[in-house]
Amino acid sequence: AEFLNRVYTNAWLKLPVGKARYGVMLREDGIVMDDGTTTRISENHYHMTTTTAQAANVLSHLEYYLQLVWPELNVNVVSTTEQWAGAAIAGPNSRALLMKLFPNTDVSNEGLPFMGYKEADLFGIPAKIYRISFSGELAYEVNVESDFGNFMWEKIIEVGKEFQIQPYGTEALSTLRIEMGHVAGSELDGRTIPHDALSLIHISEPTRLARI
């Protein structure tokens, strides 16, 4: 947690196990380097996400500070990008769909609140569920081991037919983020400070729909 405190602009020491938090990472000159969510999986185990374009740079950034600036911190970082396959499920029926996919897991608003995390079973496959919204709507991210990525996708599409589920891509996601006032990737172009991107406002004021 102390390491996260130093590399992000916001506080992490009191983040409880099973919860995620949005963070903004700055360069030494105060320019936004990246943003993303980090989840506390267990007492000393965190799962950090980054933007796709900056994943390698963020890993190098973290390793540099651990090895040369704060060697006293007992922290190890490892990329798990290739180990997990993820799917974002968003929209007003996303919770109803999750209830079908995970019938033995409580995904109600009380059981899995906004920015919450749970481990679950997807038709016999271990899965991780994050209550995270990239578009401002009620949304979740489901991760499984990469070998089961196709299996997960097929199950989501199959079970989602009764909800008229439709795949959406990055262009649609970017439009949704702009409509909801979220920071879009094009705004983090290496010339942006947090105030310009209104990042800190979005940290403290998540959209109402995402919290229902």
Named regions from a protein language model:
Residues 1-45, 49-68:
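Extended, compositionally biased flexible segments
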Residues 41-204, 208-211:
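Conserved, structured C-terminal
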